[in-house]
């Protein structure tokens, strides 16, 4: 019975229930052929002796290439003996790509749904496995080759095309620039078409290296190619396999992608296997990326950046004098920032007292600058000149955070102002006496103390009234 999609395509007829191939006499016994060269893990997995090695379980991840029920159904290879000497594209389990191969006559295997194929070129499965010319593959991993029909390919068609320089590997892709004309004579002039492959690369492929496939076959080819790559190139930070090659399957997910659903990444489709997490996507979403090829490891990037960071350590001693200068000016900056709350509290007090007498002396009397530096030393570094001229700023309300600190600052400020006022007054009298050549009058000790107390009481009384 031929398929409606064409003589070379299998029937698009699926069963929604997981089934298994019937193989009488296999339970608890070895299969009629040796699987050691086909599945290298068969000898290391003792659970295979008690189960059917070719059973299709839809609820397991295909680490041993366990197929999905969507690929089952009678196809053109279901008739024993009819597929002998047929050229096909057979999938290689080691890397997931398709290669040209020829089916060998093995009716006993074809009845069980498997085929013995001979590849056109010897394949090396890995450093520990020998080169293999013949191999047993599943029926669903074989796609029959058809004559070149390049003139019928249009943009958007799904194909398997040669993508690497050796012209041996067939990978899934989408036609970008096809031959939309239906005239074979005009199409024969064009010998190449542009194909956008699954890994983001675009290349021109000859018509003889393109095989048109259905959307279902294309999706399954991409999915299996993806899983084969993740097993060969795991990422150390994100790799968390859900099933093991050397032990029972434990972390599997029971739901697979439906046949009619678009091929999305696991971040976009929640029914995908956890092996596909953080490995790439075909949906084009930003967190998934556009390719599955491994990126540069972070350790290599850090190793290249380390030599660039070494010269900065040699420049550190040159910055020492600058740091000392900054440290000398630090008390001024800290005192100005810490006293900002105190300045707002004493705005009216500063306006009433007016500018300090030291500035008035500077404008009235031309004296030695040594005497002008004395009040600055007595007042301390925590009182910059500009703080006395600040005329605006809201007063903090009672109960706000920082009220206790502002009260302490106010008391310290009043005490410093009192000392500076006394020192400035004494300095002014000395300057006047020197200018008039008169001796300053001696003040009794009791009168000086009485004057200090009266001034402090007056300031405290004013602060209470201002509150």
From Swiss-Prot:
Cysteine disulfide partners in this protein: none
One Pfam family in the UniProt entry: DUF4537
Alphabetical list of InterPro entries matching this protein: DUF4537
Region (Disordered): 416-467
Composition bias type Polar residues, residue spans: 455-467
Protein name: Uncharacterized protein C11orf16
Organism, scientific name: Homo sapiens (Human)
